[in-house]
Amino acid sequence: MRERLRHCKRVIIKVGTSTLTHPGGHLHLGRMEALVRQIADLHFEGRQVILVTSGAVGAGLGRLGLAERPAEVAAKQALAAVGQGLLMQRYEGLFSEYGLVVGQVLLTREDLEDPDRRASSAQVMERLLAWGVIPIVNENDTVTSEEIRVGDNDTLSARVAALVRADLLILLSDVDGLYPADPHLHPGLSPIPWVSPDDDLDRFAGGPGSANGTGGMVTKVAAARICAEHGIPMVLACGERPDVLRQILAGEEIGTLFSREG
């Protein structure tokens, strides 16, 4: 199955808050630059790439000099309003260095569940890809309450992958993959190279996400299962690894491959 990843044309890449920001919440420009360079390389290879990005709330946190992510919904929505603009400004500047244009796509749960809005969202992204634009997707946190959220960007990226009939979803996080036990408690463990989303993975998926994010291994396993329902493989890998996207799409055994075929 790894060898088949070399031929994936339409790829969804999700990058998490822990990869995009420093612990204090400020954007990690070095990692953003490395990510954009890799995506540009994939684009010029002839692949279609959609980026699902976290980091809006974290960027707002850093810009306003706040020490902790607030629990209040309105405060998080306000932080997203500040941070989303900062995030897109950075992406626009970085991609423009490669002559690439980006398009912001902010989605809500209704955009993915209502048939008419779902069809409209798919048409917009198809048009952007046809024009050679890099769609940059995030949940519209500013107008979305906790009760009607998609939930997290792992789930969002899987739903986007299904929406546009992607060939592959890559989740970039602060972990190297799915481990058989907590690697913090068991140093020296290697990630599991391949698992089926149909397996009992919940025992491997304990633990919350990072302090500035909303995800964790539970949401990544859930994303893999959404992808599996649509025949889409998913790879979970560390976003801090140099050239991680090139290595995955070269068929190298990087991270954990979630697929019904080994």
Curated annotation (Swiss-Prot):
Q: Where does ATP bind?
A: K14, S173, D174, T214, G215, G216, M217, V218, T219, K220
Q: Which Pfam families match?
A: AA_kinase (PF00696)
Q: Name one GO molecular function term.
A: ATP binding
The protein's UniProt keywords, in alphabetical order, are: Amino-acid biosynthesis, ATP-binding, Cytoplasm, Kinase, Nucleotide-binding, Proline biosynthesis, Transferase
Q: In which pathway does it act?
A: Amino-acid biosynthesis; L-proline biosynthesis; L-glutamate 5-semialdehyde from L-glutamate: step 1/2
Q: What class of enzyme is it?
A: transferase
Q: Which residues bind substrate?
A: S54, D141, N153
- Cellular-component GO terms for this entry: cytosol
GO:BP terms for this protein?
L-proline biosynthetic process
Subcellular location field: Cytoplasm
Highest taxon listed in the record's lineage: Bacteria
Q: What is the protein's major site of localization? A: cytoplasm
Q: What is its EC number?
A: 2.7.2.11
Under catalytic activity, the entry for this protein gives:
L-glutamate + ATP = L-glutamyl 5-phosphate + ADP
Entry's NCBIfam families?
A: proB
Instruction: Please give the family membership noted in the entry.
Output: Belongs to the glutamate 5-kinase family.
- Describe the function of this protein: Catalyzes the transfer of a phosphate group to glutamate to form L-glutamate 5-phosphate.
Task: Give the protein's recorded name.
Answer: Glutamate 5-kinase
The record lists the organism as Symbiobacterium thermophilum (strain DSM 24528 / JCM 14929 / IAM 14863 / T)
Q: Which gene encodes it?
A: proB
